[in-house]
Amino acid sequence: MLGIEPDKSLFEILCDNLKTAKTNYDVYIPWYIMTSRENNKQTMEFFEKNNYFNYPKDKIKFFIQGELPMVGTDGKILLDKEGIIKEAADGHGGIFEAMFKNNVVEDMKNNGVEWIFVGPVDNPLVKMVDEILIGVAVDKKVLAIGKSLVKANPKEKVGVFCKKNGKPAVIEYTEISDEMAEEKDKNGNLVYGESHINCNMFNIKAIEYIGNNKLPYHSAFKKATYMNEKGDIIEPSEPNSYKFESFIFDSFQKLDDMAILRVNREEEFAPVKGKTGVDSVETARELYNKYHNRS
């Protein structure tokens, strides 16, 4: 709970977007929620307990994200406590494959869905239904569009939009040198200054095309409990294994072009990454209340 409006969960705040759209356009927009194997049951029970936030139950569908095996530093696949292959979620880029495996794309087509907004649950200011976003995409005649923010400063740790081999892409902050970070164009703006905030919209045609083309995998060094060859359960104190995941922005490289809509940070970005500190429940609550209490 964020402790706002009062004590609304992030899911309820997002659902409010959809209920507002119902008021404005007299239609219940389908809501597809990707969960993980670990939290799927708990998430569904949470919705049931809260009466689906008074949104039609048949308009909300859950589907489970895919997983990939984890490997140790020796390259061998790890086993979990039950002695079976240890797996981890395959990243938010796995949404395309998961949508096909769980018949989500088919359901969308049967419901006449043409545009799909894909956004995070951990941002209470995310706009689930943005008329301007879809309007720009249609006007520019592209199959995808993403939202961006101007970087807070050259060294802000965010991925940024760019062109790679003539196609849209996002370059991660770890790949941006100090020189690149400070580089400016003739108007004095940062060359690498359009932050990707993981709020994207895809045409169903793009979803189908991307879903039939594998995205690259990235490795992340993580700490994971596992069973060793003797059958002992090992709980490491430091990272000991690699998980593999794909990122949603890697899908941009599958497209010839896409549009970017720059938005205001104060109006659309209040990420929740922890309980306290930067990008926390505390800061998100403050940003959310500040936005909704504007005169």
Describe the function of each predicted region.
Residues 108, 112-117, 125-129, 134-294:
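Catalytic core of tubulin tyrosine ligase-like
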Residues 35, 64-66, 262-264:
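A general secondary-structure junction signal
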Residues 14, 76, 178-179:
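Short hydrophobic/aromatic-rich motifs at helix boundaries and adjacent loops
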Residues 43, 122, 203:
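Residue-level signal for inorganic ion chemistry
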Residues 1-58, 69, 80-98, 105-106, ...:
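N-terminal glycine-rich phosphate-binding loop and ensuing alpha1 helix
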Residues 52, 57-156:
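Conserved beta-loop-beta/alpha segment of the NTase-like Rossmann-fold superfamily
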Residues 36-40, 123, 266:
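Short, internal active-site loops enriched in acidic
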Residues 30-32, 61, 145, 259:
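A structural signal for isolated positions on well-ordered beta-strands in alpha/beta enzyme cores
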